[in-house]
Amino acid sequence: MKRYLDLVPISAKVHRKQNRMSIFCIALAVFLVTTIFGMADMFIRSQIIKTQAETGNWHIGIQNITSEDAAVIAARPDVAALAPYNVLNYDGKQGYTLAETEVALCGSNDRLFAKIFPNMLSEGAFPKTDNEAMVTESAKDMLDLHIGDEITISTPAGPDMVFTLSGFVENTANLMSSDTYGVFLTTEKLYDIYLTNDNNGLSGYPTVYYVQFASTLNVQSEIENLKSQCGLSGDQVSENTKLLGLLGQSTSSFMIQVYAAAAVLFVLVLFA
């Protein structure tokens, strides 16, 4: 025997079964590790989809800005979508009714259901004119409504308003729990209604602008850039913390906990 390397084939023959078991254990460990982190990733992805369906696919909400400021923000290259949102009669006590049932009047634009809440649109399209409206499925079912039908909204101070239905929206838990219909109008029409009616002393016209960034790789940096460049304070900007947490772009530790659990399982596999 001239070299120690000559022992390798001899050892391989003697320990053939042991070598096969070692290879099997290594392959099994790799499979388990891949499965663990794959399941963690699938869980995070499923939670992101669920959260986007429940709370909307928006990253921040901005309030107390003018429509001109909103237009500037919407034109930024790092903003994929911006949708205004306002509600009258959210508490169901201001006297806006449809067929004697209180309604929450919501004002926005077509990007609300195209980008921010894409899963809420069940049929039709967002109103293109001030004379059109969308209603929730509860109103459709109770009043046997169809696209193209006319509905009449009674107001507390002004005359009744007639709208042509352009589509239907999924019910929300808040509206269902309060036995209230939801009616969606253009932003301009809702503001006109606000000016026409007393609104029981409602002060101001607070509009929230939902913002969806084009990239989610560094949302916190984009938020800070938006604040500094547009002169926004921390009180004006609110985050969709649940969604950002799942995307790893929030101080929320949920996603970190999921991957930490996967890492612990990985260590256990190594020791096994």
Feature roles, as predicted:
Residues 41-248:
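Basic-flanked hydrophobic alpha-helices used for secretion and membrane insertion
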Residues 1-21:
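Feature of multi-pass inner-membrane transport and sensor proteins
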Residues 2, 6, 241-248, 258-264:
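Alpha-helical membrane and juxtamembrane elements of multi-pass inner-membrane transport
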